[in-house]
């Protein structure tokens, strides 16, 4: 019978990235069914309670405390896992070189150690991120806020304060940026060039920058804004500042803007600013339609189309290419680590006239809960496994590809599923071998649906893309050059006899 074990470490703080890495290692230990290392805020305790691993001893945990929570197959496995967690918390350098950096107790102390620094990357629980961002701004630092769960009013106030000081606030929930060739957060190794990217989406920036790189071009900067910057309450403060910066940069010749559809009033602000530039823009408002753009801007419906416009190329459609299993029918089940890649797939399904459901639906798609209350699914389904409902108390699937194992096993066993659509996202911050994990999971599983995947990354990444593609191909996975082409391949494999919505 499973046992629940908790331990509270008083007045203990570790960076959220380190906590996720420790969680991943503990969850992989023998006999561990679920594991979470998390700061003891009320919201985080609720996450652990929902996951079924919060013990009564953790009820008294404060926001300054660290909770170790796990479910194990037996007490012996649980105690061994707790001991390993204690060791890694006390000696985070054991995680590897990335964790073995000198640390400072305060931001002021860090500035004394590195006085030339001009940017703070903030990765603390949302309850503390606002205060740390204010400290950064007051010290004259730009702020990239990796943290989420920051109130919208606080985000707007931070960005107004930054604008007054001539500083950037990227985020909250900004997972990706590349500044002068230096990747921050989840980002890929791409060459420098003359294309600037502004993105409200981390995986959107990653996909477009990698497609540009694989076409032989490069970027100047990729500036993340956070997913809510284009809401009316924030007013696109960071987006507008980023346009100003890239417009003034002599090395940037073409500017790309990627986001979900903005509020109408905010869209006018952004497009009015675009119109004042002498530079060409490519604008991808994912899921938007009939947006009137200024003369110097072109619209792109997908991330792939965005890259094609920028580099002046276009790949042949998978609808005209031979595929094994063509016309096999059934339903497509998409299981994505990247939220924007999930959105792009839905858009392509809707463009093809196909009904699609998702836990994060784009306009025209239907909403679905995680379990759909036991209802039989009769439409194609695209699931964002990085959404909060799947990551409460667990690592993000880009850290831990095992998050996809359960939903993938369900899809493999579902007789209504004919095709499975997957994304593999590489780069700094991600799992060291996501393709290897998937290949091992698929090993020995016969009579399975057709599996189509894309690999977002470059050959220069810590996990070289060419090696990841080879591992997937050896496992019998069809690998497309982009997420859009993988989606087109899945649709093509359905064959010509499709029910159109």
Q: Which residue stretches match the model-derived regions?
A:
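Catalytic-core regions of core metabolic enzymes
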Residues: 2-501
């Amino acid at each position: 019978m499973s046992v629940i074990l908790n331990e509270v470490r008083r007045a203990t703080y570790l960076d959220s990235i380190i906590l996720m890495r420790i969680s991943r290692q503990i969850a992989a230990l023998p006999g561990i069914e679920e594991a979470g290392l998390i700061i003891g805020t009320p919201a985080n305790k609720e996450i652990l309670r929902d996951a079924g691993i919060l013990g009564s001893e953790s009820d008294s945990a404060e926001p300054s405390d660290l909770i170790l929570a796990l479910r194990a197959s037996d007490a012996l496995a649980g105690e061994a896992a707790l001991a390993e967690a204690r060791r890694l918390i006390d000696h985070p350098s054991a995680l590897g070189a990335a964790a073995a950096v000198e640390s400072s107790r305060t931001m002021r102390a860090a500035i004394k150690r590195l006085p030339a620094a001009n940017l703070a990357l903030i990765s603390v629980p949302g309850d503390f991120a606002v205060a740390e961002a204010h400290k950064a701004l007051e010290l004259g630092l730009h702020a990239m806020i990796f943290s989420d769960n920051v109130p919208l009013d606080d985000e707007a106030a931070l960005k107004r304060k930054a604008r007054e000081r001539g500083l950037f606030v990227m985020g909250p929930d900004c997972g990706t940026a590349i500044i002068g060739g230096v990747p921050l957060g989840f980002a890929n190794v791409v060459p420098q060039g003359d294309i600037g990217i502004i993105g409200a989406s981390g995986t959107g920036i990653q996909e477009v920058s990698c497609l540009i790189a694989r076409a032989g071009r490069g970027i100047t900067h990729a500036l993340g804004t956070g997913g809510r910057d284009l809401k009316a309450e924030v007013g696109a403060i960071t987006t507008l500042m980023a346009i100003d910066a890239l417009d003034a940069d002599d090395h940037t010749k073409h500017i790309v803007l990627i986001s979900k559809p903005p509020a109408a009033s905010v869209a006018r602000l952004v497009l009015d600013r675009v119109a004042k530039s002498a530079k060409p823009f490519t604008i991808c408002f994912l899921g938007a339609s009939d947006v009137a753009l200024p003369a110097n801007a072109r619209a792109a419906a997908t991330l792939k189309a965005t890259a094609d416009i920028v580099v002046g190329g276009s790949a042949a459609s998978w609808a005209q290419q031979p595929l094994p299993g063509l016309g096999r029918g059934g339903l497509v089940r998409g299981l994505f680590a990247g939220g924007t890649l999930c959105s792009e797939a839905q858009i392509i399904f809707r463009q093809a006239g196909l009904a699609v459901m998702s836990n994060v639906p784009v306009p025209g798609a239907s909403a679905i809960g995680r379990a759909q209350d036991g209802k039989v699914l009769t439409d194609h389904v695209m699931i964002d496994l990085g959404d909060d409902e799947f990551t409460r108390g667990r690592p993000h699937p880009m850290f831990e590809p095992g998050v996809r194992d359960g939903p993938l096993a369900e899809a493999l066993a579902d007789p209504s599923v004919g095709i499975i659509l997957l994304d593999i996202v590489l780069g700094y911050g991600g799992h060291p071998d996501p393709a290897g994990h998937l290949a091992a999971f698929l090993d020995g599983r016969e009579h399975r649906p057709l599996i189509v995947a894309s690999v977002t990354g470059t050959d220069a990444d810590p996990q070289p893309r060419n090696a990841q593609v080879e591992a997937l191909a050896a496992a019998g996975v069809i690998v497309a050059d982009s997420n859009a082409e993988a989606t087109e391949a899945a649709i093509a494999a359905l064959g010509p006899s499709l029910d159109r919505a």
